[in-house]
Swiss-Prot record:
It holds the Pfam family YbeY. It comes from Caulobacter sp. (strain K31). It is found in: Cytoplasm. The gene is ybeY. This is Endoribonuclease YbeY. One of its GO terms (molecular function) is RNA endonuclease activity. It is an enzyme of class 3 (hydrolase). GO terms for biological process: rRNA processing. Gene3D superfamilies: Metalloproteases ('zincins'), catalytic domain. Zn(2+) binds at residues 118, 122, 128.
Length: 162
């Protein structure tokens, strides 16, 4: 069985801003999945949505009534236990992602790929609830993104001292 990454574009703003958005998303998801041999044969659905859709998902499933950059919904706690082979779904909000990228001085493409990697790691059981877990997750994100030629998303911006 082969691994699948299904990308659903609900908000065309994604393709207007990044014409190669599907390739960017697939590349980031695949980079994480390639580093985890134990999940071969499982699939992920990635929804590129608008802020309203992500706000609805966040409200309905997490009881938080606001749009957020990325949501991850694992299918089960152990991917091997899922008979259909899906490890979960990810949803990304265009407006939130675009604003964050601009605020952080990053390209939308790089920010999107970081958030996809972050979301896939959540599906695989990574978390950032405490400092040790956050450090481990961020280290893995840095490693994955470096392989995609994306700068460290957690690096402090260079100061403009003069």
């Amino acid at each position: 069985m082969t691994l699948t990454v299904d990308i659903e574009i609900e908000d065309e703003a994604w393709t207007k801003a990044e014409p190669e958005v599907e390739a960017l998303v697939w590349r980031a998801a695949q980079a994480v999945l390639d580093a985890h041999e134990d999940i071969e044969g499982h699939g992920i659905v990635i929804l590129l949505a608008d802020d309203d859709s992500v706000q609805t998902l966040n409200r309905d499933f997490r009881q938080k009534d606001y749009a957020t950059n990325v949501l991850s919904f694992p299918s089960v706690t152990s991917p091997g236990a899922n008979p259909e082979g899906q490890i979960g779904d990810i949803a990304l909000a265009f407006g939130v992602c675009q604003r964050e990228a601009a605020e952080q001085g990053k390209s939308l493409a790089h920010h999107l790929q970081h958030l996809v990697a972050h979301g896939v790691l959540h599906l695989l059981g990574y978390d950032h609830q405490d400092d040790a877990d956050a450090e481990a997750m961020e280290a893995f994100e840095r490693e994955i993104l470096a392989g995609l030629d994306i700068p460290d998303p957690y690096a402090e911006p260079a100061s403009a001292e003069g």
